[in-house]
Design a protein with these regions (language model features):
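Metal-dependent phosphoester/phosphodiester hydrolase catalytic core
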Residues: 2-280
């Protein structure tokens, strides 16, 4: 996601007090190390240090995974990349020029969605897609909430492809969650996809970073969510069949204990062809 290079890294814009040249060298070194040590079928990096890592992976007729790169081509975060920013004070987040994927990757995704014919269409990417905006407060501008027009373009691509069973896999926010995704079209909320957000394995939770009140804020703002856990660490375990999708949210009581067991905190299911997630 981002920490291979730098926190909330965006394109070629230094995110820390650092020279442009120093940042470019660090970014190139990060992608070289990533290519050398991660089991990905791409590369090697180009002469300028860039590495195309967005790609699709097909599993027969069951599923196609569109693995996106939401860092290398994105616009810089608007409004100082702050947390809990009044929406009225940050109209820049609505600008059409703001991109999460870059024009070339956006078109690649739209073309891939249109051509896809598997039962499940899976968009695997980094940051939370569903809106986390309460009244006038935007929780995190590094997420798709800071790239509203880009999110609408992705939703348009899904709608235009006329695909059912579209699942979005996300992370980054150090919390777990599951929510249906909707687009506003002609005054009507149109179901577009279903998002599963995996929490961090050991990085600080939102509660640890922002305090316990943030849980109530997230639960209020994520009104379409069927599951939210902003405290525990763990991972997601997914089972996919032609008939349905099951995500088990696994949590560990103590990440400092090698012997701590992993338990199922919640199970969320989606029946093929259905429009809503169901928590069991």
């Amino acid at each position: 996601d981002d920490h291979e290079v730098g926190n909330n890294y965006a394109g070629k814009v230094p995110q820390e007090p650092e020279s442009t040249t120093g940042y470019a060298n660090r970014r190139s070194a990060a992608y070289q190390a990533y290519w050398e040590h991660m089991p990905i079928r791409t590369g090697p990096p180009e002469a300028d240090g860039s590495l195309q890592i967005y790609r699709s992976v097909r599993v027969g007729t069951l599923a196609e995974f569109f693995v996106l790169d939401g860092r290398q081509y994105r616009s810089d975060q608007v409004c100082g990349d702050r947390l809990a920013v009044p929406a009225s004070a940050c109209p820049e987040r609505l600008e059409a020029s703001q991109t999460m994927l870059g024009a070339e990757q956006e078109q690649w995704l739209a073309d891939g969605l249109a051509a896809n014919d598997t039962t499940w269409t899976v968009i695997a990417q980094q940051t939370v897609v569903f809106p986390l905006v309460l009244n006038d407060l935007v929780l995190n501008l590094d997420q798709w909430d800071g790239y509203v027009a880009a999110r609408e373009r992705m939703f348009d691509a899904i709608i235009d492809a006329d695909r059912e069973n579209v699942v979005v896999l996300s992370g980054d926010i150090h919390s777990g969650g599951a929510s249906d995704l909707f687009a506003e079209r002609n005054g009507t909320r149109v179901p577009v996809a279903h998002e599963f957000v995996s929490t961090s394995i050991s990085s600080l939770s939102i509660i640890a970073e922002l305090g316990p009140d943030v849980v109530q804020l997230v639960e209020q703002v994520a009104e379409d969510a069927v599951y939210v856990n902003a405290e525990d660490h763990g991972y997601c375990r997914v089972t996919i069949t032609p008939e349905g999708w099951t995500t088990e949210f696994m949590t560990v009581a103590n990440v400092s204990d090698d012997d701590a067991p992993a338990t199922v905190d919640a199970t969320v299911e989606l029946t093929a062809g259905a429009r809503k997630l169901v928590r069991r």
